[in-house]
Design a protein with these regions (language model features):
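Extracytoplasmic/periplasmic ligand-binding sensor regions of membrane-associated signaling proteins
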Residues: 94-174
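Juxtamembrane extracytoplasmic/periplasmic/luminal helical "stalk" adjacent to the first N-terminal
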Residues: 1-73
Length: 174
């Protein structure tokens, strides 16, 4: 009986020691794995942000977009057919970046040119973000989570008119 009790005691101590060593090893490996995963995700996020920045710059400087917004600034309202012509243009740009759900183009007076509905920019986001985009003078301003769709993030860029001394021509929202 004493031999059995001694063996149970030794096995119990060995089990406890093995448990603590293995849990420490698993915890260390899990921390390393989480750290590597976070670094990879951060790298992918940085790449996506850079893609969105580049894409919105391309859209904002597109010759057709520039012509439409310049005409709007000069007081000529954009005809419906010209607004429809933005669909293939924006679809082509959206095809390059998988993280973009929509591109929206607004005039200086916050009227939406694309997509084709009459939602105002001021009804979509707070005026503080419009002011931030104006102060950024063409830089992309990250707004945050879209209140209408919590799975998306909003960003806004002021479109500067290249042929009008880089004055404001409108806004591009992603």
């Amino acid at each position: 009986i004493s031999f059995m009790l001694l063996m149970i005691f030794v096995l119990g101590i060995a089990s406890v020691l093995t448990y603590y060593r293995m849990s420490a090893l698993l915890q260390t490996n899990a921390e390393k794995h989480i750290s590597q995963t976070a670094m990879q995700a951060n790298g992918r996020l940085d790449a996506l942000i850079a893609q969105i920045n580049t894409l919105t710059t391309q859209v904002a400087t597109d010759a057709y977009v520039q012509r439409l917004l310049l005409a709007e600034v000069q007081g000529k309202e954009t005809p419906f057919s010209s607004r429809q012509s933005l669909l293939p243009l924006f679809s082509d740009y959206q095809a390059y970046v998988t993280g973009i759900k929509s591109l929206e183009l607004y005039t200086n007076d916050y009227r939406r040119l694309f997509p084709l509905n009459e939602t105002q920019l001021i009804d979509t986001i707070d005026s503080e973000w419009i002011n931030a985009a104006n102060w950024g003078k063409g830089s992309l301003v990250w707004i945050g989570i879209d209140p209408r769709d919590p799975s998306t993030v909003l960003a806004l860029r002021r479109v500067s008119l290249l042929d009008r001394w880089f004055s404001s021509g409108g806004y591009l929202m992603v």
